[in-house]
Amino acid sequence: MCGGRGTRLATDAEKPLFRVGGVPMVDRVVGALRDSAVDRIVAAPSPNAPNTRSHLDVPCIETPGEGYVADLDAALADDRLSRPVLTVAADLPLLNGEVVDRVLDSHEGGSLTVLVPASLKRGLGVSDDTTFEDGGRVVAPTGVNVVGDGPDDAWLTRDRRVAVNVNTIADARVAEQWL
């Protein structure tokens, strides 16, 4: 998923092309996927990220640019994808193949949402705009999911590699500390 505007990032760069440690975030995510057991990578840019689309060297499914959920729905409706589908946000510069493989190994059918404790995000000093209660704990989504047919499940991890989503310049500074 690489079509966001990145308005909270307050930069002229398209969010997926924003550089963390000198490398565009989307390149770091594509590299993590290439280093994993994932067998096919398809990007989902939008009109909000035209330079991202031309930058990528993987097949793309164009999305409408109407927000993450609408763009995800559009991508999942494309005939080139079959479920289950691993979805990954382009703003996870610490992601690597090992973490992706752990997510895939944790998937037991249906859909899987990867969560981290909200306290971990706060402890790392990164934004935690979206939190909710799950099993008596306050958690945050990571931007990594498996979308399948069937029941939904959640996987809670304390791995900072999925806890650090770059939404602000301060988040980018935190990410660079962990590279």
Give, region by region, the residue ranges found by the protein language model.
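Short catalytic helix/loop segments, enriched in acidic residues and glycine
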Residues: 15-29
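Conserved core of the sugar-phosphate nucleotidyltransferase
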Residues: 55, 95-179
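N-terminal nucleotide-binding beta1-loop-alpha1 segment
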Residues: 1-13
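Conserved N-terminal catalytic core of the sugar/cofactor nucleotidyltransferase
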Residues: 25-89, 133-134
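A short, conserved beta-strand element in the Rossmann-like catalytic core
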Residues: 8, 93-95
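Short beta-strand/turn micro-motifs composed of small residues
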Residues: 2-3, 44-45, 89, 115-116
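Active-site glycine-centered loops adjacent to acidic/histidine catalytic or metal-binding residues
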Residues: 4, 91, 168
